[in-house]
């Protein structure tokens, strides 16, 4: 709560004080169909950013919602690499679990492009690959162990909520959600 909500509020106060030209909020697919606390706090950060888009006229603002970013700290590949180093089977929560993935290089390019097109609190969601955890694990090793879903974990994350699917504009490489006024 402190980072995702209070941190966003503090950043918005700072952009008002400093008359910043642009504000980009980085979010997660867990905000789309939020149920655990983490997803709800990310969703609130998105809404605060959309609010800023309408009320802070000097600053262009937007949210960028990503899935799992490959080559970042704490991702499944980092965990699997550690397991491989110790000759252990790969930990799989649920073989049929599906997740969206994007490479860190694509993330950087997408953020830079969004700084150009950001305007009034839009949410930009890049198109990402959807894979089952088993499919990914099989590309690395045939030795797996199923550890089960963690509390609050979903079989498949969504990029858009049901309401957002109705209003999202599909572009060649992304979805754009215009904020409600």
What are the language-model segments listed below?
Residues 1-63:
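N-terminal Rossmann-like NAD(P)+-binding domain of SDR-like oxidoreductases, especially those catalyzing
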Residues 47, 51-181:
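Strand-loop microenvironment adjacent to phosphate/nucleotide-handling motifs in alpha/beta enzyme folds
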């Amino acid at each position: 709560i402190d980072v995702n909500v209070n941190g966003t509020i503090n950043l918005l106060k700072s952009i008002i004080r400093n008359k910043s030209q642009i504000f980009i909020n980085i979010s997660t697919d867990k905000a789309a169909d939020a149920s655990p606390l983490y997803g709800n706090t990310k969703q609130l950060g998105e809404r605060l950013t959309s609010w800023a888009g309408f009320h802070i006229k000097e600053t262009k603002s937007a949210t960028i919602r990503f899935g799992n970013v490959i080559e970042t700290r704490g991702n499944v590949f980092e965990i699997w690499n550690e397991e491989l180093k110790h000759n252990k089977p790969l930990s799989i929560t649920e073989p049929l679990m599906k997740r969206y993935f994007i490479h860190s290089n694509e993330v950087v390019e997408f953020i830079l492009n969004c700084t150009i097109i950001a305007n009034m609190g839009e949410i930009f969601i890049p198109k990402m690959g959807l894979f089952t955890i088993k499919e990914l694990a099989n590309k690395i090793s045939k030795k797996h162990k199923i550890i089960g879903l963690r509390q609050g974990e979903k079989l498949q994350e969504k990029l858009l909520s049901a309401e957002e699917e109705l209003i999202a504009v599909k572009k060649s490489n992304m979805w754009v959600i215009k904020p409600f006024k």
